[in-house]
Amino acid sequence: MDDATKSSLKAIPLCKTKASPRDGDLWIERLKEEYEAIIAAVQNNKDCDRDWFQLESNERGTKWFGKCWYFHNMVKYEFDVEFDIPITYPVTAPEIALPELDGKTAKMYRGGKICLSEHFKPLWARNTPKFGIAHAFALGLGPWMAVEIPDLIEKGLIQPKA
């Protein structure tokens, strides 16, 4: 893990409540912790000039959507990002999807869900329920984009938006 990732990870508060959307009031408490962690992560990223995503959810906090972006050779590449909170959350990590990249890389499942199984999922399992959405972005989506997006650009499979 590089120093920038370690630094951004340390700035993300850990979650305490082990709850999923089916847990009623406990889920509301977990959702508050998730938002606090996301806000801290976004603020830290902005403070370090590494702002790279924005997220929002439906009212129940079960469906999340937003944008993520990656700069390559001074050009911004922006993507829609979405995921649902699994019923077994936080034991099961969310499956983060970049739908417009579906089928463009082998490190992706149907529907544009990024492949995180080898490196991220064991880390998530060791840190349940402390890790949350912000951690999934910092340790899952961020590193995935850092590897895959430049490769897709070099192969001519993605173009910057006008």
UniProtKB/Swiss-Prot annotation:
Sorted UniProt keywords? Ubl conjugation pathway
Query: Which residues does UniProt mark as catalytic?
Result: C115 (glycyl thioester intermediate)
Q: What does this protein do?
A: E2-like enzyme which forms an intermediate with ufm-1. The intermediate is formed via a thioester linkage.
Top-rank taxon of the source lineage equals Eukaryota
Q: In which tissues is it expressed?
A: Expressed in the intestine.
- Please name the PANTHER family in this protein's record: UBIQUITIN-FOLD MODIFIER-CONJUGATING ENZYME 1
Quaternary structure, per UniProt, is:
Interacts with uba-5.
Q: What's in the GO CC field? A: cytoplasm; striated muscle dense body
Q: Kindly name one Pfam family recorded for this protein.
A: UFC1
Q: What is this protein's record name?
A: Ubiquitin-fold modifier-conjugating enzyme 1
Q: Which GO terms describe its molecular function?
A: ubiquitin conjugating enzyme binding; UFM1 conjugating enzyme activity; UFM1 transferase activity
A Gene Ontology biological process noted in the UniProt record is:
reticulophagy
Which family is this sequence assigned to? Belongs to the ubiquitin-conjugating enzyme family. UFC1 subfamily.
